[in-house]
Amino acid sequence: MKTIHDIRRSNARKLRDGVGGNSSFATMIDREPTQTSRFMGDGATKNIGDSMARHIEKCFDLPVGWLDQEHQTTNITKKPDVSITNKQITLVPVISWVQAGAWKEVGYSEVDLSTAETYPCPVPCGEMTYILRVIGDSMIDEYRPGDMIFVDPEVPACHGDDVIALMHDTGETTFKRLIEDGTQRYLKALNPNWPEPYIKINGNCSIIGTVIFSGKPRRYKIKA
């Protein structure tokens, strides 16, 4: 059974990842990164006490006691303010690339939110937003394997947006940049060494989501 300290540490880590890492989190709560690492790093040596828990909640504009509870849904009753721009945060789930292909149709019915890995999205997003971990190297150097991309299916894609597309012939999802040139539209791989960097859109695919934010976990390892 998880202890209160386990729950607090897990929630703090999600907030940390949502704002871009330990340094940003430390700035948010007006502490040194070395101090925050001691209570939520991989080798944490301290627990998050009551006063620190309440301090973190206050800095993120969260209800008192939020850090003490496990959160099994994608919604936070009171969305935290994590920047001076007052952007809202919603917890969203990490899903597979296969699930992404049918997400608009099945959505959360395909994900057990009680066990799903969820993270706060630092920018305003729709209720259907999800997270994918980048695989492959077609979008290097801007995106690397293991990077987390937050995808909102409800945001219309425009020229220059990075998008998730469903290929009709294979049923597979792909991650590329949308290029519009006059009346023509293309999917572009950002890797300059990619053998076929452009895919012409001619009814062969559907754009099913727009990337609205990305993050780079520093300790994530690709599973073999």
Curated annotation (Swiss-Prot):
Additional comment: This protein is part of the e14 prophage present on the genomes of E.coli K12 MG1655 and W3110.
Name the UniProt record assigns to this protein: Prophage repressor CohE
PANTHER family the UniProt entry points to: LEXA REPRESSOR (PTHR33516), LEXA REPRESSOR-RELATED (PTHR33516:SF2)
Gene Ontology MF: a single term: DNA-binding transcription repressor activity
Alphabetized UniProt keyword annotations: DNA-binding, Repressor, Transcription, Transcription regulation
Gene3D superfamilies: Umud Fragment, subunit A (2.10.109.10)
A GO biological-process term: SOS response
Record-level GO cellular component terms: protein-DNA complex
